[in-house]
Amino acid sequence: SSEFKSKIVIGTWSLSGDYGSVDLSKIQEVLLYCYEKGLREFDTAPSYGNGFMEFCLGSVFGNKSDVLINSKIGNSPFYGKSFIIGDLKKSFECTLKRLKRDNINILFLHNPRTEIHDYDSIHQFMDELKRDGKINFKGISLAKGYDYSSIDLNRFDVVQDDANLLSMDYKKLILSEKTLFMARSPLASGLLSGNIAPNTVFEKNDHRSFWLKGDRLISLMKRVDKIRGQSNLLLPIIARKFLLEDTQINRIIFGIKKKEHV
């Protein structure tokens, strides 16, 4: 339904090559297909494919005003993590160049943990970008498993975090009505897709090959089987339905790698 459609943001990490290689023409085809289907909001980051994903979005959509692009700062291609204002500025300028635009929708801090000691100067920098019309909203993308209780998340317009049937910590976040919550990883890196088994082995260039294996994979699959047993719907449908119906969630990032995922 259109009410649900407006909740959907297309995630581009899985297209970028970090989940196994994808070629350029295929990426362009998938992005245009999303656009044709009325999906106009995309989530990306400079580190996805080392700038490659932003470059692809720029070459497909350029400055199109009916496309919303959300990106991140704090983790740059080849350079790694830094939340020093000068580095954030540089990173954001490179993002605009790659995207071929003068404005983006939401700019997120990319999974900061202990690196930021002074959020005030960061807010000042992001508020300036808002005033200059370079970004519409400022956000923070939360790192998995890190405790943000000492930070006032309500100073941000948008908070992004993992939210799925295997990651329910987002329920503990206390956000004001003015702060939107954006869910990511709805299928828990594929664990809720129905395509992973306890003996699955991932390609070497797929980031999951590092952490999703052995006992960890087996114990997660036990939890997945439990979820599967509670309904006769297909697993990914159970997972998506749960998020779409959760009123605490304002937007959901669905990652795609091919047209069939749309």
Predicted regions and their residues:
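Beta/alpha (TIM)-barrel catalytic core signal, keyed to glycine-rich beta->alpha loops juxtaposed to Asp/Glu
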Residues: 112-261
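Acidic (Asp/Glu)-rich catalytic clusters
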Residues: 2-5, 36, 58-68, 96-102, ...
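Conserved, mostly hydrophobic/aromatic
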Residues: 10, 34, 42, 57, ...
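Active-site mouth loops of central-metabolism enzymes
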Residues: 13-25, 73-89, 115
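N-terminal binding-site loop/beta-alpha segment at the start of enzyme catalytic domains
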Residues: 1-68
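Active-site groove signature of glycoside hydrolases
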Residues: 96-117
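Short, acidic/polar
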Residues: 21-34, 83-100, 142-150, 239
